[in-house]
Every structure is written in C-alpha cells, then in structure tokens.
C-alpha cells in the first residue's frame, strides 16, 4: 500500500487560501522582523513550503524567543506543555496591541 503519512496530511481545507489571495505572498512578509518577547500568530502560508511549521500549530499564538538563520524560534503552548517551534517569517503575523 501507499504511504499516507506526509507532513501535510489532513490539511486539505486547513491550508486552503481564498480565491483572490492565491499565488505567492508579497516580499514584505519575507523581510518582516520581530522583537524577542513579541507575541506572534502562526498562520501557515501554504504556497511557501520552506520553514513551514507543523499543522498542529496553525492558528496558535506564541512568543518569539530567538532567531535561527532566516527563521524565528517561538514558544507555543500545546495543551499543558510549552513547545518550541521554528518557522520562517512568511508563516508568522505580529499580534496587534
């Protein structure tokens, strides 16, 4: 039988974009930067596969704790535990204050 357990399984509707928002994201989403301690939302950009966090963290809010190359290191609560997530800036949105 075929292998059905890829990293994007069960994401048919979760990662779907609106009709008018399809295509590559603007450059401003790539060059955005964050402060350490800043709160950010994990919103997966399905057209960019590099640096994509696990589907479990889509829609969660975390705190920036560092940077790893072009990606950002986040602390995200997952149930009772706190997990570290590495994601590129295309998949992050700053929380409005």
UniProtKB/Swiss-Prot annotation:
Signal peptide: none annotated. It comes from the Archaea. Keywords: Ribonucleoprotein, Ribosomal protein. SUPFAM superfamilies: Translation proteins SH3-like domain. GO terms for molecular function: structural constituent of ribosome. GO terms for cellular component: ribonucleoprotein complex; ribosome. Gene3D superfamilies: Ribosomal protein L21. InterPro entries: Ribosomal_eL21, Ribosomal_eL21_arc, Ribosomal_eL21_CS, Ribosomal_eL21_sf, Translation_prot_SH3-like_sf. One of its GO terms (biological process) is translation. Belongs to the eukaryotic ribosomal protein eL21 family. This is Large ribosomal subunit protein eL21.
């Amino acid at each position: 039988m075929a292998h059905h357990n890829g990293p994007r399984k069960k994401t048919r509707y979760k990662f779907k974009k609106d009709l008018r928002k399809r295509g590559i994201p603007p450059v401003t989403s790539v060059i955005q930067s964050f402060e350490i301690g800043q709160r950010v939302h994990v919103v997966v950009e399905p057209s960019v596969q590099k640096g994509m966090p696990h589907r479990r963290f889509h829609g969660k809010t975390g705190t920036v704790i560092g940077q790893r190359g072009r990606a950002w290191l986040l602390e995200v609560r997952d149930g009772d535990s706190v997990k570290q997530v590495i994601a590129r800036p295309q998949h992050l949105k700053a929380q409005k204050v």
